[in-house]
């Protein structure tokens, strides 16, 4: 798989995260390797040990949110992605919630190269893999919270 080529500025990509985030339960992110900058959906700050929805010093800031036993795994992955030795990110590991408890996530993304073919961005989506299902696909019944929401919306 070959990396895509950037046709957007960092600002445009960050704006896209802000635009699409309210439409999703998952968390979109943009990591700019050259600027050492990271932007994630604003609602991620409410859930995880993140100081803000955007920051510089990507590795140092991830030390605050990644479960310590999983940090080396992520650091190796980021090195491979930022040097072009890997172009697709798909990693299961743990982040810390606001209470400091580990939360299993799946983080996927794709590397986007600059015009010289060097990795510039990693863009993708982070989702919680431990979330309870909202509905049972066998019975078709909604789960508790979803059922209550559905009933309130149909009064």
Sequence positions of predicted segments:
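PAS-family sensory domain signal
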Residues: 2, 8-63
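Signal-transducing coiled-coil linker helix
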Residues: 12-14, 20, 139-143, 150
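PAS-family sensory domains
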Residues: 50-122, 151
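Sensory coupling linkers of modular signal transduction proteins
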Residues: 3, 116-146
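Active-site-proximal structural segments of metal-dependent nucleotidyl cyclase/transferase enzymes
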Residues: 26, 147-155
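Hydrophobic pocket-lining residues within nucleotide cofactor-binding pockets
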Residues: 33, 112, 129
